[in-house]
Amino acid sequence: MSQPDPVKKKRPPVKEEDLKGARGNLSKNQEIKSKTYQVMKQCEQMGSAAPSIFSRARTGSETVFEKSKDEPPKSVFG
């Protein structure tokens, strides 16, 4: 009833120059679709800094479905 031990296959050795070429081709000819990257790129084009998570301009409750309101953020202590 015991299963035979799986046969371990040896991988061929990888050369350092092969890795360098592969890393360069990973994102070549592909558009980056990250939202963070898009926001950073837009801010760079406008000449302003990207929004920070430590900025008080955001309340932390913003989501894709529910945008921040114009009213000031509510305090958790008040």
Swiss-Prot record:
Entry keywords, A to Z: Myogenesis, Nucleus
Tissues showing expression: Predominantly expressed in heart and skeletal muscle. Detected in skeletal muscle satellite cells where expression increases with cell proliferation.
Localization of this protein: Nucleus
Basic and acidic residues compositional bias, start-end: 64-78
GO annotation (BP), single: chondrocyte differentiation
InterPro entries: MUSTN1
Chain spans, region Disordered: 1-33, 45-78
GO terms under cellular component: nucleus
Transmembrane feature ranges: none
Broad class of the protein's primary localization: nucleus
Positions of short motif Nuclear localization signal: 6-14
Functional description taken from the UniProt entry: Promotes the differentiation and proliferation of skeletal muscle satellite cells.
Annotated family: Belongs to the MUSTN1 family.
This protein's name: Musculoskeletal embryonic nuclear protein 1
